Structure formats: C-alpha cells, structure tokens
C-alpha cells in the first residue's frame, strides 16, 4: 500500500532525497490558507516534489505573482516543467546552494519562502536562510515535529537550545499545527509540524556581528550540564562584565534569547575578540 502511494504519477520516492510526498488534501488546504498568498507575491517553494502545494499556491496567485520552485530531483523538476504554468519558474538544484538574495534582486521583491522540507537538510537550510533574511517576508515550513519543537521552544524547556536561540533571535516563530505520518506517501517514521517564521524588522535588531553571536551561543550550549561561568569563561574577561548583571550561575538553557543578545552587544561594544564560529 505504501509503495503504491509512493509511486504517484509514476515516481518512486527516493530515500537519498528524504522524499515523503504530501497527499492529505485537508493538510494541504490548511498550509495554503496559513500562507495566504496574495496576487503580487513572489513565492519560493523548496522541494515542490509532485506539486501538492505548488498548484494550490499558483491558483491563489491568480497569474499575477510568481512561484519559483527549487527541486533537487531532476526527474521531478522535469515533471513539473512539462505540466507547465506561466507563473511557475523551475530551478533544478540544491536549495543549500541557492542564492536567494540574487533572486530577490532580480525580482525586485522580497520573498515568501515555503516548503515541505526534507528532514535531512532542514537545520542546515534554516541556518543558510539566516544570511538571506533581509530579502524574506516570511517562511512557512513543514518540519520534523521534534525540530519544530526545538525552534519554537521556550527557555527552561527540554527542547530549548542553540537552534532556538539562533532562530528566535532573528525571527518571530509560530508553531501552527502538527501533521501525522499518514498525511504523506510514503509515511515518515515521525510526526511533522508546520511553522511560520517572520523576520524581525531590521530596526528592531541590535547591531551585531552575527558570526560572533553564533560563536557565543555555540560556546554557551557546548556543555549543557555546565553553568555558564565555565562554558563562557573566556568572555568574562570583557571589561565591566559583572556590571552587566548577567547571571552566569545558570545553565545555557535557562537564559532567554534577549539576554543572549544583550550579552553579545556588551561583548562587542567592549571589543572583546570572540572565538571564531
């Protein structure tokens, strides 16, 4: 039964690409409604697969917007190209190597990025997109439920970690709904969840060297059981560190995102040479 579902339109899901095709119409409708495409939008879909989200999104665009689809499986890219649509532009290649900023410049528009992401590239892709966030309106992604929980986690929770801090420092994150394995063919071994991620306005973000911020967060979470007095010992040589009022008797997972940002600002303003990320 699973194999039959996986051979939709003559294509067999390929494990090396982490392919699980969305087949539940109610879930598809819920995702498209959450995205709420507007006629003038420039959408980018990562991993369109057989087009479960692609075609409903194109219908909502109504011919006025554009949908760029990035597909690594060349057979699927060719399949979508053959079906043809005036507003659909196919890019056969790896989303991890795709230049989203260049596309935004070419379109003279900020991008709305969507996708049912292969689980094996979700974290690397999210970090790749951090460098492109000035060109992005929002992102709607289907992710492994555990990864979604880590991204949206609150301080002090079991899931709160480096991924939470790095992404929440740059985005407003909203976990929309969960999706069961039966919504896919073949069904994955885990549940999924849909997230909305909207970049914070640049004026609301501190002026930081974000590579140094990444190094700070990585150091903080390098040993979760140790308190920050030990994991961030190199940073405590910063002038006026104690005057900042930062409680380094806590563990990394107890510190809110805002405090990491304030700490990074203080370190940067005092010209401390942070370790390279």
Curated annotation (Swiss-Prot):
Its EC number is 2.1.1.182. It catalyses: adenosine(1518)/adenosine(1519) in 16S rRNA + 4 S-adenosyl-L-methionine = N(6)-dimethyladenosine(1518)/N(6)-dimethyladenosine(1519) in 16S rRNA + 4 S-adenosyl-L-homocysteine + 4 H(+). It comes from the Bacteria. GO terms for cellular component: cytosol. It holds the Pfam family RrnaAD. Belongs to the class I-like SAM-binding methyltransferase superfamily. rRNA adenine N(6)-methyltransferase family. RsmA subfamily. This is Ribosomal RNA small subunit methyltransferase A. It comes from Burkholderia sp.
